[in-house]
Amino acid sequence: MSPLFDGKIPGTEILATIKNENVGLLLQIPWDFDKKKPCIVAVPASDSDGLYNAKDIQIRGLWGLKHNCAVVYNDKGLGNGIYDITNDEGFTIDGKVAKDNLLFKPYIKNKTNYIKQNPHRYAIKQLHSKQNPESKWATYILNSFDFALYELNEMFPTMGKLDFTYNNTLTLIYGANDGATAALKAAESIGESKIKGVVAVNPQIQLDQENTSLIMETKFSVKRFQLKSAIDYSTFAALYIPCAIPAIDPSKHDNYVPYASKYLFSQNRCDELKNANLLSNGTPKEALEKLHNYGWSPETDFQLPYFYYYESIYYPYKYISAYGKFDVTENMCDFSVASTQQDPYYNSGEVKPLKEIKFPEIWGLYNEHLPIWANEDATAIDLVENKDMTSPRREWYSSSQIVDQIDYGTKGAICLRKEINNQRVKEGLKQIQSSANLHKIKTFIVHGKNNVKQLAEHTSRPYVALNSVIEGKESQLRYIEVENASYLDGKVPFDNTLLAIDYYGEDAMEWLWANLTNNTTLPESQVIRTKPRGGNIGRAPQVTTENLVPISQKPDSNDLIKANNGGIFIPY
């Protein structure tokens, strides 16, 4: 690439769908694709995003294109699958509003009656497809590789033979968050014959919670992992975070807790939790202590208000609805997806038709994650509490027990917590659990130590420990844990406290590339001792190598992470 690289790479782009599940695929073949040393980078979409999300295109996809590789994205069966029930319309793969050939169009029994009782409602593919797409993520990645190889052979044909096959093409997977989960699942399912390397950043990987043999050791303690699923700890968070906010100590950098001032009704949530016998004293301090005991460390407290404000109840809801294969008409836990009041003035989150934002605009605003924001202070579409004491509205504004006493929808949060024990949900969860057998594929897992969304203690750390049992000394897994990094990217309001985890994803990809193309020795598993930028929010100093310390090929012995026979040692 030229030193004057402007982000524009010429080439060919091809869109396709896997028809039965309407999984979106996007293939990019750069003009300087190396036909003599062919490579394909598969990028399963981050979280619940669609094909054209900025981070995958600008970070993971760009990495592949800059290395002269073809890049193939897949939306994991999620994508921009939003369907307007009232107007019978949704989106095609290229973003057009239509009534047919949609990314998602559910069958709704007694549709007219449902619309009458539930106006301005929407169906979401991840929530309402009834397919539990996560159980098929590995297959979708294999499909994306097959698609890429087929198109490469079509574009660069040689009479009588296929020039590009799994045998002669370097095949890599680079994913983040749920895309990282998909990457690991693909390695487990497909094996070394078709996948040569994986980088997984902040995977929401889930093991069998009944496995009680795995050990975590630090400099000061040895304990067994108490494994919890994502739906377990995220429903726990959804219960207690709104109550805990007033007990959070301000950041030592600027005496401030981002977004804490938005929580005006925390004590109401605490009171309702006490009434439900979920708190003894009904104080924010008690709620925060519960979160600490469940896996959130005190050093991550300052992220919790922001995390809940933008993730809210929807984060656990999407997994539970998918695992349980709930129909849109079931309105699980009396929640549904609706358009809401978009005007920020005197906003109370009521169900309203789309007005300021039109449905065609949703394609550009929506990443398959709710809420869809109309502006900084109001949503266009969100999960709503149907049984609010006054009328259906966003759970952020919901009074579930006493009229006009906002408690952030406590009743719905309690119901959702109970749903994790629903047999149909447990069966769906079982379908997506991981084996940790990577079949000797060279793999990096990169995880932010301060990640409040994908808790390392319930995801990557036990996964590495289990892999040490399954593969033993033949394992090619490297684990990189980064201090002062989360699922966030180090921008305002966390520019002074958190660093961009994606820097380390790219660094891991460079090490993997060097090993697979030049036999460079891979680094050992390690903790990266970073340093926050400091200063005030919005005015943090420029990042330096003191802040973003690169992965070391030969880390200091005090930074080594070791895994052996079901145990993992983290040097803290």
Go through the PLM ranges and name each one.
Residues M1-Y572:
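C-terminal His-loop and adjacent cap/lid subdomain of alpha/beta-hydrolase
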